[in-house]
Amino acid sequence: MAGGCGRRRVVVCAVALGLSAAVLALTAVVLLRAYVLRSPAIPRLWARRGSTAAFSASERRELKEALRGAVRIPTVSLSSEDFNTTAMAEFGDYIRKAFPAVFSSKFIQHEIIGEYSHLFTVQGSDSEMMPYMLLAHMDVVPAPPEGWDFPPFSAAEHEGFIYGRGTLDNKNSAIGILQALEFLLRRNYRPRRSFYVGIGHDEEVFGQKGALKIAALLESRGVKLSFLLDEGSAILDGIIAGVKKPVALIAVTEKGLMTLNFTVEKEPGHSSFPPKETSIGILATAVSRLEQNPMRSLFGRGPELMTMEHLASEFNFPLNLIMSNLWLFSPIVSRVLAWKPSTNALIRTTTAVTMFNAGIKFNVIPPSARATVNFRIHSGEKAKEVLETVRNTVADDRVKIDVIEALDPLPISPWDDQTFGVHVFQRTILDTFPNVDSVVPGTCIGNTDSRHFTNVTNAIYRFNPVLLKSDDLPRIHGLNERISVESYEKQVEFLFQLIKNCDVDKLPEPHANSHEL
């Protein structure tokens, strides 16, 4: 008996020691990864220089007024067949007057594409260097004046801000690119590396007549791009919980899109003797099932994992330990991210019921009911998979489901120490924005014109070099869209320096202070 107890104690001690060793080993791994990830996943190849373009006072006034003039032109697009063609043509005339050096340069070719879009080919002095492209769009979403502090197309300047539709999406980029090029030309600067500038006129309605045709033209000419930079993410200040410093988030992919119509048809009748289920009730049940059963979390199957790991060193304890060890803590992080709509959108395909139409009179059983649901598809799945999940969730043959439009997510662009574009962005951001220490990859929630260019490059990046705070986000497509004059000056400075930085023909050796980023 005593011998048996002794053996049990030995076994218990051995198990306890084994568990202790496992816990210690796990703790060591967690701490080691937290230590290793203090340095960036991509080493800094450039020393921070701290200064870039020096614009004169008159140039700063000029760039501000050039943007204001463009914002005053109501280049609204409502649908692929309904947009303000008069304003689109006026925008073309406007940029010719605003940027005379660009339009008179002997090494810049300008073409009108799809009647209103613009393609500029800037011929560099070294034809051996692979070209790149800067992309933007002139069109804007509608802006009814109700609720605005200033008329949406007045470009009013108030307390250091320019108010107006397009100040953030996306005339700031369209005008900023041309402004930077104008300033470079005045300084007799000719780029070594060729590049293209594309300005679409129908991005807000999927770019079928603008960017799509520009991309097709480049492909027909055999053009291959080193990278393409379009609108998308930005420099986020105070938006990422737990991170105090501004973070430059560059989207390496964008979510897909699918819009479905749901229809239920039943015999109409009088409300005094209703059937057990009406068309409205059946459809309401189907829609409720979709809302109560969100798409599965795909955390870790898209760029969101890279985003967290690249930001790990910016978080305070204990978040830095958690973000450095997502191999262990990802289930917890995924659940936390699901709490808020803004972060939930990063980890799954989202479901949004946007339209519901039914009923003709208070005492009539309606013959039909219709709903529209919009899905933004995570990069870890395809539209076909989402449709199958929707059908299985609704599980009712009485509900007819029609696909209105479907776009798969774009491939994830390279983000590593061999990618030229990534290092050029890093260098330009760090020099232009001294308060930014982190340049990280991410996901663009919306859709951009860049999706049309996958046949000419696999390196597509989405970044609007402006500083955004939490209260700026609802202004995009919303009321009182605005940009600070200082932020726009920085955007032009970024683009000015980006063009110059792209003229290096190879990457330098890693900088000794790579741990700084």
UniProtKB/Swiss-Prot annotation:
Binds 2 Zn(2+) ions per subunit. Keywords: Glycoprotein, Hydrolase, Lipid metabolism, Lyase, Metal-binding, Protease, Secreted, Signal, Zinc. GO terms for molecular function: aminoacylase activity; hydrolase activity, acting on carbon-nitrogen (but not peptide) bonds, in linear amides; lyase activity; metal ion binding; peptidase activity. Zn(2+) 2 binds at H137, D169, D230. The keyword Secreted applies. Glycans are attached at N84, N261, N455. Pfam families: M20_dimer, Peptidase_M20. Its cofactor is Zn(2+). CDD domains: M20_yscS. InterPro entries: Bact_exopeptidase_dim_dom, Pept_M20A, Peptidase_M20, Peptidase_M20_dimer. GO terms for biological process: adaptive thermogenesis; amide biosynthetic process; amide catabolic process; amino acid metabolic process; energy homeostasis; fatty acid metabolic process; lipid metabolic process; proteolysis. Transmembrane segments: none annotated. Gene3D superfamilies: 1.10.150.900, 3.30.70.360, Zn peptidases. Zn(2+) 1 binds at D169, E204, H477. It is found in: Secreted. GO terms for cellular component: extracellular space. Pathway: Amino-acid metabolism; Energy metabolism; electron transfer; Lipid metabolism; fatty acid metabolism. The active site is at D139, E203. Lipoproteins are powerful coactivators of PM20D1 activity in vitro and NAA biosynthesis in vivo. Secreted enzyme that regulates the endogenous N-fatty acyl amino acid (NAAs) tissue and circulating levels by functioning as a bidirectional NAA synthase/hydrolase. It condenses free fatty acids and free amino acids to generate NAAs and bidirectionally catalyzes the reverse hydrolysis reaction. Some of these NAAs stimulate oxidative metabolism via mitochondrial uncoupling, increasing energy expenditure in a UPC1-independent manner. Thereby, this secreted protein may indirectly regulate whole body energy expenditure. Belongs to the peptidase M20A family. This is N-fatty-acyl-amino acid synthase/hydrolase PM20D1. The gene is PM20D1.
